[in-house]
């Protein structure tokens, strides 16, 4: 009887511990949760390669503790659809697929629930690109203009309750970069959510090549796909600002968490 009484007291004493643990759970990975692929080109413009090399290191640092596997490639010709589909997301830093085979594999990957995080030049397309699917995928049409040289810019959050922007300030300064403007209006499209834009307070924007106005989204998602495009990615300063880096991590986590097979972070 005394032993039963002692066990009851012990059990009751543990209740607050278990309650606290449930209120503040921690989910430690017992194995890598998923695989991600980083793609960039060493043959791109020098400033884009600078960004890409830093980008590779940025995402590699996120693997510390083996939370996920990260593969890096400079050739998508080695990744047909059957291989691409092994990855929860593909991160393109300064280039996009080339040629019919690479493009077809990427289209199939995205149409079947693949994840894509694209930076700056990875989304560049003009009338010579001749890839209508990619233009629709991005939602912005073809290239219109850009500022030059790379400059810092004030950015405004458009959607403050989105997972990518919910912990960002309403406005913040982006590190120096070149930013693209596009031909088509993203805001009139039901399938596009604009998350971040350059503030009109930046105008006139540029020293050599000057942009005088216009709506300028720089981060958005196409709701028909598991994707996000981030317009920044020129030079070696893009990872120098904590708020922007936080947004990059948010974007990565959001894309990964929406894997059709289930949220890897819940494993």
Residue ranges and their predicted role:
Residues 27, 35-126:
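Helical hinge/lid and interdomain linker segments adjacent to catalytic or ligand-binding clefts
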Residues 7-17:
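Bacterial N-terminal signal peptides
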Residues 23-34, 58-61, 201-218, 222-267:
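Extracellular ligand-binding/catalytic regions of CAZymes and related secreted enzymes
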Residues 115-117, 193, 226:
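Proline-centered loop/turn at the N-terminus of a beta-strand
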Residues 148-224:
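Catalytic beta-strand/loop cores that center a nucleophilic Ser/Cys/Thr
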Residues 96-169:
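A glycine-rich, often tryptophan-bearing local segment used as a flexible ligand/cofactor-contacting loop or short
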Residues 1-4:
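Positively charged n-region of N-terminal signal peptides that target proteins for export
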Residues 54, 58, 86, 101, ...:
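Extracytoplasmic/secreted proteins, especially bacterial periplasmic and envelope-associated proteins
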């Amino acid at each position: 009887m005394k032993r039963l009484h002692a066990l009851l007291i012990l059990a009751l004493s543990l209740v607050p511990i278990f309650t606290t643990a449930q209120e503040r759970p921690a989910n430690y990975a017992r194995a890598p949760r998923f695989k991600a692929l980083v793609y960039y080109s060493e043959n791109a413009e020098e400033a884009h390669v600078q960004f890409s090399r830093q980008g590779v290191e940025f995402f590699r640092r996120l693997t510390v503790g083996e939370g996920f596997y990260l593969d890096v490639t400079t050739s998508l010709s080695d990744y047909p659809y059957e291989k691409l589909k092994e990855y929860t997301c593909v991160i393109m830093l300064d280039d996009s697929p080339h040629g019919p085979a690479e493009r077809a594999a990427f289209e199939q990957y995205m149409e079947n629930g693949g994840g894509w995080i694209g930076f700056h030049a990875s989304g560049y397309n003009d009338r010579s690109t001749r890839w209508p699917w990619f233009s629709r995928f991005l939602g912005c049409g073809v290239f219109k203009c850009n500022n030059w040289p790379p400059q810092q810019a004030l950015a405004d959050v458009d959607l403050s309750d989105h997972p990518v922007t919910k912990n960002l300030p309403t406005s913040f300064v982006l590190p120096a970069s070149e930013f693209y403007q596009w031909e088509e209006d993203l805001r009139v499209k039901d399938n596009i959510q604009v998350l971040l834009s350059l503030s009109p307070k930046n105008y006139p924007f540029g020293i050599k090549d000057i942009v005088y106005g216009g709506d300028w989204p720089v981060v958005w998602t196409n709701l028909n796909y598991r994707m996000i495009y981030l317009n920044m990615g020129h030079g070696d300063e893009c990872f120098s600002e904590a708020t922007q880096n936080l947004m990059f991590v948010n974007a990565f986590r959001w894309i990964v968490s929406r894997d059709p097979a289930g949220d890897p972070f819940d494993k």
